[in-house]
Amino acid sequence: MIEKLFHLKKNNTNARTEVIAGLTTFMTMAYILAVNPTMLSAAGMDSTAVLIATCLASFVGTMAMALLANYPFALAPGMGLNAYFAYTVCGNMGYSWKVALMAVFVEGIVFIVLSLTNVREAIFNAIPSTLKKGVSAGIGLFIAFIGLQGAHLVVSNSSTLVTYCDFAGNWHTQGICAVLALIGLIITVILYIKGFKGAILIGILVTWILGMLSQALGIYQVNVKEGFYSLYPSMHMTDFSKIGETFGQCFKADFHGVGILNFIIVLCSFLFVDMFDTIGTLVGVSSKAGMLDENEKLPNIKSALLADAIATSAGAVIGTSTTTTYVESSAGVGAGGRTGLA
């Protein structure tokens, strides 16, 4: 059954490698479960409802990508797009989150049409091979920078934009996080050099265990105001009935005072950012995985773009901002993921 669905032998992989790759991708993008509810709650949405919507939209999108395109690309509400949703459309422009969700829904429908008519595929194939390789390298550097920021190894600075972490000044928060990140990075690199396919996953798990030990010993201290949370697993049960507060609400949007021109501007903003975000991600991740053919084209690209478009509209109906293909999928690809099973 699994072989028939995902063609593991044809792609020179096996179930064990694909599962490890899938877990690796999940671990690298799980941060969205905390970040997305926080960001969209600024638009007036219930954070618990957004958490559930984020999970469901990610599930629908990733399953669509796996079953329609058989690619190891995970989907979830996109960073940047959720910030635009909350702080620009609902914040500066003053529209309700229901109107914003409707814009995302319509964007997804437009994308479905563009995908079925091969317009998005034509744009993807029109990108020169040299640019595709450049995008792949750029995305790698982008992920590395995000990782350094998340690990607090680099922090913002008014003079130089970024600078190194002050280990001594904030030892119990920033400092210990940076040290743990360095330890995890060293472990991951050593395992990767030695050929362990689960190197990234093992590195993440070891770092987490060391983090919990640091918290237990008082070396790492929780400071919610500064964004340093408990590293222990939470046993708190989510109230799943909250999903009713966002599910289908895009169809109840009140357009009084919005104006058709303003709605089109919002729609086009979501449309173009999502289009090139998805294309850039597919180029970078597929290039890293060696999935491009001799003409530097991605086989079955139409199905991949269609899955992404379906996820966008489905996510809006469920109650979250634009659901898109995640560049963190490259971590799973690096762990050996080659099919939708990952």
Segments (PLM) and residue ranges:
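Membrane-helix interface "capping/anchor" motifs
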Residues: 63-77, 190-201, 334-340
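Helix-loop-helix junctions within the multi-pass membrane cores of secondary transporters/permeases
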Residues: 2-36, 57, 78-87, 91-139, ...
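Transmembrane alpha-helix interface/packing and boundary motifs in multi-pass membrane proteins
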Residues: 61-73, 189-192, 269-277, 308-318
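Membrane-embedded alpha-helical modules
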Residues: 93-209, 213, 342
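Active-site cofactor/substrate anionic-group-binding motifs, chiefly glycine-
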Residues: 46-92
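Alpha-helical transmembrane segments of multipass membrane proteins
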Residues: 59-67, 88-89, 112, 185-190, ...
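Short, amphipathic, aromatic/basic-enriched membrane-interface segments that mark the entry/exit
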Residues: 42-50, 69-74, 163-176, 333-342
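Helix-loop-helix hairpins and the membrane-proximal interhelical loops
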Residues: 1-49, 165-169, 204-302
